[in-house]
Amino acid sequence: APHDISVALHLLGEEPEAVAAQGLTYLQPGIPDTVFLTLRFSSGRAAHIHVSWLDPHKVRRITVVGSQKMAVFDDVDSTEKLRIYDKGVQRPAYDSYGDSLSLRFGDISIPRIDMREPLRLECQHFIDCIVSGQAPLSDGRNGVQVLRVLEAGQQSLERGGEPVVLERNLRNS
């Protein structure tokens, strides 16, 4: 879950105001084998994360749903890692009775992504930051944010899925 949380925080550019987690335990009492984590943000956005070491399929997929387009990144797929869907919802003006939402379907684009070793890129970025003095994309502050979310998720699990609110002064530090 740490990587999923880190990606969500990076994509959304904010720390959640509340975290809720529910877990299912099958094999070892007190240790969830499957966890569903929900992060709620003050902007009204949400992130849903599902992790399970029991799952028979290796899944590393991120789905981003926007008002105009949607994107699916599949880290396991070696040929079509990213798909962008021109799909959205159009809201009517509601000036007449019976109007409803209409779904808009368009093209699917699959941009070319050069295949390079992620760990090598991460190490090279770190070295480049040391040499240039620039701040890395993922720094100690990001690590602390991820740990706060993980801790809130653990507290929520222990409280039966009750949302845990992150204190505002911690979210902005």
Question: Which positions does each model-derived feature cover?
Answer:
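NAD(P)-dinucleotide binding in Rossmann-like oxidoreductases
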Residues: 25-30, 42-121, 168
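Short secondary-structure junction motifs
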Residues: 16, 59, 159-161
